[in-house]
């Protein structure tokens, strides 16, 4: 299995270095649900601003304030403790009376707004996230500037970030032990983290191998192509390659890579043979995913940050702004820009 730091770069290995997250204010995340609160219902959506506290900690504190069970407070995604983040929590509080959430006090946390909503906010139920990052002590400004321009045009690999695999790769190591011993794992959280790490690592490996080709965006027979911004996909045939290539070049279609698991992967012929060969050595992880009935899926191979802009504060400090769809990692963007340093270089989302 390729180590995350050794995965293939789309724009070549960065020449410069920089400090990511010198302080929490250098990493700002604003959650985008993609919808507004209903204004009625048995749930309350609460938009919070937090700094220095993780999502679960705030959710538990909110439950205590509302005198409800912790399981009655949900969220669409975890946000990093070591960052300034805006996100929505959802509390189930039936009844017509609206609690005064402006009285909720927690160090490092502020309630920005709240409103009634009809449905529970479930994990993953968000459109995306807007990021504002500040990279400090940047070396080789010219190389970084050119990479910023290239990312606007060509995007970045849609790798799962190192944080998906746990501190020191602990989640992936857990998955490997599980696969090798077949010992039942009772802890539901561990099961989820380990299976997710296994599938994500296989996806990363397939993408890394594809990036070694001369033209990563060259459609091949049997590729599974996804409509940009959509989850649906279809299989490319030889008769359609020229037209499909035009649509990929126009970013209307995206080439996908497999999230291996049980069932068919989605590609056929040449593309399927390539994907299978890319992870042929990882028989234990593949067998684990099939055994645990994790359904195979597809994910876009490349990621095009939206609303992408940057501003150099001085020769060694640059602020970068962009929006990513849910499930994508800001660190996969930064990875193509600089070699990061700092205690939290890999801990982003």
UniProtKB/Swiss-Prot annotation:
The keyword Isomerase applies. Gene3D superfamilies: TruD, catalytic domain (3.30.2350.20), TruD, insertion domain (3.30.2340.10). Pfam families: TruD (PF01142). Substrate binds at residues 27, 129, 329. Its EC number is 5.4.99.27. GO terms for biological process: tRNA pseudouridine synthesis. InterPro entries: PsdUridine_synth_cat_dom_sf, PsdUridine_synth_TruD, PsdUridine_synth_TruD_CS, PsdUridine_synth_TruD_insert, TruD_catalytic, TruD_insert_sf, TruD_pseudoU_synthase. Residues 155-303 form the TRUD domain. Keywords: Isomerase, tRNA processing. SUPFAM superfamilies: Pseudouridine synthase. One of its GO terms (molecular function) is tRNA pseudouridine(13) synthase activity. GO terms for cellular component: cytosol. It comes from the Bacteria. The active site is at 80 (nucleophile). It catalyses: uridine(13) in tRNA = pseudouridine(13) in tRNA. Responsible for synthesis of pseudouridine from uracil-13 in transfer RNAs. Belongs to the pseudouridine synthase TruD family. PANTHER family: TRNA PSEUDOURIDINE SYNTHASE D. This is tRNA pseudouridine synthase D. It comes from Escherichia coli O8 (strain IAI1).
């Amino acid at each position: 299995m390729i180590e995350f730091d050794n995965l293939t770069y789309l724009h070549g290995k960065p020449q410069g270095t920089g400090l990511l997250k010198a302080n929490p204010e250098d990493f700002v995340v604003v959650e985008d649900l993609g919808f507004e609160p209903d204004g009625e219902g048995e749930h309350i959506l609460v938009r919070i601003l937090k700094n220095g506290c993780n999502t679960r900690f705030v959710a538990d504190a909110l439950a205590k304030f509302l005198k409800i069970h912790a399981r009655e407070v949900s969220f669409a995604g975890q946000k990093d403790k070591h960052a300034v983040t805006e996100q929505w929590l959802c509390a189930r509080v039936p009844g017509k009376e609206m609690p005064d959430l402006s009285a909720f006090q927690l160090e490092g946390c502020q309630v920005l707004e709240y409103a009634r909503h009809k449905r529970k906010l479930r994990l993953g139920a968000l459109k995306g996230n807007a990021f504002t990052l500040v990279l400090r002590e940047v070396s080789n400004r010219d190389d970084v500037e050119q990479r910023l321009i290239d990312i606007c045009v060509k995007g970045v690999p849609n790798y799962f970030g190192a944080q998906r695999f746990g501190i020191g790769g602990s989640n992936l190591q857990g998955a490997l032990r599980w696969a090798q011993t077949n010992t039942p794992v009772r802890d539901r959280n561990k099961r989820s983290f380990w299976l997710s790490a296994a599938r994500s690592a296989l996806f990363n490996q397939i993408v890394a191998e594809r990036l070694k080709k001369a033209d990563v965006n060259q459609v091949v027979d049997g590729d599974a192509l996804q409509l940009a911004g959509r989850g649906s996909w279809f299989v490319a045939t030889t008769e359609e390659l020229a037209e499909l290539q035009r649509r990929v070049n126009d970013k209307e279609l995206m080439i996908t890579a497999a999230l291996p698991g049980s069932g068919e992967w989605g590609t056929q012929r040449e593309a399927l043979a390539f994907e299978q060969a890319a992870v042929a050595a990882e028989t234990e992880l593949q067998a684990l995913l099939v055994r645990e009935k994790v359904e195979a899926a597809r994910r876009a191979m490349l990621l095009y940050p939206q609303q992408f802009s940057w501003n150099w504060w001085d020769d060694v400090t640059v602020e970068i702004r962009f929006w990513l769809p849910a499930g994508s990692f800001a660190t996969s963007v930064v990875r193509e820009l600089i070699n990061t340093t700092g205690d939290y270089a890999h801990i982003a989302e």
